[in-house]
Amino acid sequence: MNAKKRKGSAVERNIVGKLRDKGFAVVRAPASGSKRKDPIPDIIALKSGVIILIEMKSRKDKEGKIYVRREQAEGIMEFARKSGGTLFLGVKKPGVLKFIPFDKLRRTETGNYVADSEIEGLDLEDLVRLVEAKVSKTLDNFL
């Protein structure tokens, strides 16, 4: 495994560990470089019936754009549709880790997807709060 893939794998493992610590059931399912024919997101996290799907991308520089190839994007969007999960692009740049809802990505003329630096994302704590808000039950749920 080359250094770039090792670093990306380390980021994914770190996120998996943090989500587990927050009570999620988590699977790391990296497919890049493998012989898998069916595209799947890098991280699948579940908590009380809520499914979060994360495709991770990293950059060495803070300002560069993050691209997802059309074929990969279509495959993981189909996985999200079939699973009922919410798909995020996890972006790791120097000093930055954010999770962008996939539907906020911009589509290029060639059909690829791109995350500009200006696109707002959630940090890990905000992502956890989003899920916990979906699973929290109030008295109104039982009336």
From Swiss-Prot:
Residues forming the catalytic site: S32
Q: Which UniProt keywords apply?
A: DNA damage, DNA recombination, DNA repair, DNA-binding, Endonuclease, Hydrolase, Magnesium, Metal-binding, Nuclease
**Which parts of the sequence bind Mg(2+)?**
E12, D42, E55
Reaction(s) the record says it catalyses:
Endonucleolytic cleavage at a junction such as a reciprocal single-stranded crossover between two homologous DNA duplexes (Holliday junction)
> InterPro entries per the record?
Hjc, Hjc_arc, Restrct_endonuc-II-like, tRNA_endonuc-like_dom_sf
- Provide a Gene Ontology MF annotation, just one: magnesium ion binding
Top enzyme class, one word, equals hydrolase
Q: Does the keyword Transcription apply?
A: no
- Relate the assembly described in the record: Homodimer.
The name under which this protein is listed is Crossover junction endodeoxyribonuclease Hjc
Give the originating organism. Answer: Saccharolobus islandicus (strain REY15A) (Sulfolobus islandicus)
Q: Which gene encodes it?
A: hjc
